[in-house]
Curated annotation (Swiss-Prot):
It is found in: Cytoplasm. It catalyses: [protein]-L-glutamate 5-O-methyl ester + H2O = L-glutamyl-[protein] + methanol + H(+); L-glutaminyl-[protein] + H2O = L-glutamyl-[protein] + NH4(+). Its EC number is 3.1.1.61, 3.5.1.44. GO terms for cellular component: cytoplasm. Residues 4-121 form the Response regulatory domain. The active site is at S209, H236, D333. This is Protein-glutamate methylesterase/protein-glutamine glutaminase. Residues 197-391 form the CheB-type methylesterase domain. SUPFAM superfamilies: CheY-like, Methylesterase CheB, C-terminal domain.
Length: 391
């Protein structure tokens, strides 16, 4: 079944090019256009698309207001297009708060010049987001969260090889585990009454993608100022957006939230957001641990920042004293890094399917048998505070 799309933009050129690009994919069908936010609200009701692409800045009714009205009257997955400016980043975060599912930078040059990577990204986002609507109206698909699918691997992963190359002090490459049957995913009923494990932690690391901004805000705003450990945040997000996102979180949270910088010393009660377009790793030992933030030109690691890269670095720096959490997101970034953490004795949690915007990254963790618990989003902060002893 093709994903039915409503394209919303006040630029006729952008509407036409987005439509042409989407319809290159046989699994996507553009069923209509809207030229402003008011038009979008009306056509969302009349056409009932599976998903909507929408510009943030439009006449008559802006994108943020349109998102609010659509989500109130005809809830539909929405992908926002936003300019790569500080005001554009702030507006995009407002749109996500209003209910939009995800966003892409609005780059006319990529659209005009048929940038292959940009085209594939747009098509994949539209299909993944649109299918969330299709799954809601179709019969529920069975959850595989309690049925781990183990895929034995005899060779080092690309991540492990990359990590060993980047970290000059590494002397061995960790081999992926073949089975984690001793750490099954915990059911929700068990989670509600579960007490702290008593395990010792030094670091919390959280990785996410689609749906992550709202998920992170939900969790971090519930943490106390005296949270006992540093927190590393890896959110797939362009470089122009991470400063605004860190600033927004910092204004809402009791803990300090900042965009990570080269040489930052890791401190308890501070959350460090990986900068867009760069990787974030950990250098040093003990109290002298600092962050290494750098541009990665490797083609072997698709995401910048990458959850895998940071998780792998945490496994080396902290061994088993890490609580890693994988939240909503497309793809499987984080799985190989979580595998290395698991081998070091770390604890891995995954967000459950029902509360995810996109059940991709957490599903990869669960299916690989790496998650000791699968948690609904609204319970993550409660469990986290209990687990680290500040509940």
């Amino acid at each position: 079944m093709a994903v039915k799309v409503l394209v919303v933009d006040d630029s006729s050129f952008f509407r036409r090019r987005v439509s042409e690009i989407l319809e290159l994919d046989s699994e996507i069908e553009v069923i209509g256009f809207a030229v402003n936010g008011r038009d979008a609200v009306e056509k969302a009701a009349s056409l009932r698309p599976d998903m909507i692409t929408m510009d943030v800045e439009m006449p008559v009714l802006d994108g943020i207001s349109a998102v609010k009205e659509i989500m109130a009257s005809n809830p539909t997955p929405i992908l926002m297009f936003s300019s790569l400016t500080r005001s554009g980043a702030t507006a995009t975060l407002d749109a996500l708060d209003a209910g939009a599912m995800d966003f892409l930078p609005k780059k006319f040059e990529d659209i005009a010049r048929n940038n292959e990577d940009a085209i594939k990204l747009l098509q994949s986002k539209v299909k993944e987001i649109g299918r969330q609507r299709i799954r809601r109206v179709a019969s529920p698909r069975p959850s595989s969260i309690n049925k781990p699918l183990f895929t034995p691997t005899s060779a080092p992963s690309a991540l492990a090889a990359r990590f060993a190359q980047t970290n000059k002090t590494a002397t061995t490459v960790v081999q992926p585990e073949r089975s984690f049957n001793n750490s099954p995913v915990t059911s929700r009923s068990a989670i509600v009454t579960k007490r702290a494990s008593g395990k010792h932690y030094q670091l919390v690391a959280i990785g996410t993608s689609t749906g992550g901004p709202v998920a992170l805000q939900t969790i971090l705003t519930q943490l106390p100022a005296n949270f006992p450990h540093p927190i590393l945040l890896i959110q797939h997000m362009p470089a122009a957006f991470t400063p605004a996102f860190a600033a927004r979180l910092n204004s809402l949270c009791k803990i300090q939230v900042k965009e990570a910088q080269q040489g930052d010393r890791l401190q308890a009660g501070v959350a460090y957001l990986a900068p867009g377009g760069q990787q974030m790793m950990i250098d040093g030992r003990g109290a002298s641990r600092t962050l290494r933030v750098f541009e990665d030109n490797s083609e072997r690691i698709s995401y910048k920042p990458s959850v895998d890269v940071t998780f792998a670095s945490a496994a080396k720096a902290y061994q088993g004293d890490v609580l890693a959490i994988v939240l909503t997101g497309m793809g499987a970034d984080g799985r190989e890094g979580a595998r290395m953490l698991k081998q070091s004795g770390a604890t891995i949690w995954a967000q459950d399917e029902k509360s995810c915007v996109v059940y991709g990254m957490p599903q990869a963790i669960a299916n690989a048998g790496l998650a000791s618990e699968s948690l609904p989003l609204d319970e993550v902060a409660i469990r986290l505070k209990t687990e680290v002893g500040c509940g």
